[in-house]
Amino acid sequence: MLIRFITDSAKPIVIIGDFLVIIMMIGRALILDGYTDEPAGLGVPPYIGIYPRYAYGALDKYNVKVDYITIDKFREIRGDFNLNKYDAIICICGFHTPGKYLNANPATLKEFVSILYKYDGLKILGGPAATKYGSSMIGGKIEDESKYKAFFDVVAEGDLEAVLNDLLREGSIEKIDFNRYRTYEELREYAIRGAKVVKKHPNYPYIIAEIETYRGCPRALTGGCSFCTEPRRFGLPKFRDEKDIIDEIKVLYNEGIKYFRIGRQPCMFSYKSIDSEKEEVPKPNVEAIEKLFKGIRNVSNPKVLHIDNANPAVIARHEDESREVAKILVKYCTSGNVAAFGVESFDEKVIKANNLLTTPEDVLKAVEILNEVGGKRGETGLPYLLPGINLLFGLKGERKETFTINFEYLKEIYDRGFMIRRINIRQVVPFFGTDITLKDIKKAEKRKKLFLWFKEKVREEIDNKMLKRVVPKGTILRDVFVEVKEREDLYFGRQFGSYPLLVGILDKNLKIGEFVDVEVVDYGRRSITGKVVRDIRKIHIVG
């Protein structure tokens, strides 16, 4: 049998007869973070997502020397950066719920290809963009990026950390399954080892660690919402143990992280629900949720501890248990917390056509419960726990009346005196494997003017009034982080946390990266204007 070795390559190749085997010898690797945004997970600065941390942990397990850089930092120093000193480069990116970002510019696969075009080592792709579902930075559109994915040697369709582990263990691309998912038992080591990467982030220590509690969704029992990738990727919920989550947070906290979002799940109120594999709207497991958050507080003293998603149907249909969960979140989390409700539509025809399940009555009840339990103002200047509402357009069954129905329900919420922290309005993307088709998108294009009209109407007639209710004039917002200088006498900043308010700060002598206390003096449509309070004795809490 003819055996030949080719060694003048960053990827050593062995040819055995007619077979070509690529042998991996990775001593040094780079993680290039192009950011991620998914239905149940965020990895755009100021957040550091789970993908780079877990990938770092898998590489560290095999004693690989790992560097980490964000795409924004890489663009700054690209001319001086020698990529060929690495045996492997792991690129992370992908968007299933694209948004607008104040101080970050995510990468695309096309950009990654242009960066690595002359790179000789192993090229690995991870994150949502590596999956069959695709990625989109723009609502209502999705591009065919298969030609860019083909550029990479390894495309982690499953879990990036699992693929990296197998690659390093086996030493050969041909022996690994790019579709493999990791178990929570093996994830524990990756998560704890990967905590070290936070110190390599250019914004350290001012970053928020996104923490995973579970993935999958009870809605998978009937296929899930028509547009959503979560149940299609992960099926029914698989829960992470409280101890594993707490231990990861302890390590991250000891590495200097003081900001956390327990955000990588479709519904915080459904964590460890006993009937999650039998019921689409499972009863909250109050004991498990208290064990988790109490445990987090026992090992850390975070400046920010927030959540993300919550299913309003769970809150409304299990009122007693949900009130207890909300009280736990108020007790252990910091104020300014937001439970994002995936309402998507108040139109019952759209709800039925897209298997959304949650009714308008569910939403109104859930909004009422969180306002009653979480509406008191806390030390940050914001209420402890408020709902957010996500609305999605371009769904099946959408009609002209849908826009009016959605607006009327938002108006009812306002007229009843409730507070909503944010209203997120976006267009659906036809991801692979979901029930949304290009035909649905083309139909939605015909209603583009209606969509823009609706968005403008909500911003003018709901958002502005709601801001004045959530943060009345005179409210002091503590620890606003100065991020951008717009002009000589105007800066923009935000507090750390879930869905922070954009604050325009009227001042001439601020520094980017400093924290200031700001008094609310005026309002934009979705932002506020404030002035710095420098005399601590003048600080008071409004409401």
Swiss-Prot record:
Claim: 4Fe-4S is one of the keywords in the record: yes
Protein name: Uncharacterized protein MJ0274
Keyword annotations from UniProtKB, A to Z: 4Fe-4S, Iron, Iron-sulfur, Metal-binding, S-adenosyl-L-methionine
SMART domains: Elp3
Alphabetical list of Pfam families matching this protein: Radical_SAM (PF04055)
Domain TRAM: 470-534
GO molecular function, one term: metal ion binding
Biological classification of the source: Archaea, Methanobacteriati, Methanobacteriota, Methanomada group, Methanococci
Start and end residues of each Radical SAM core domain: 203-460
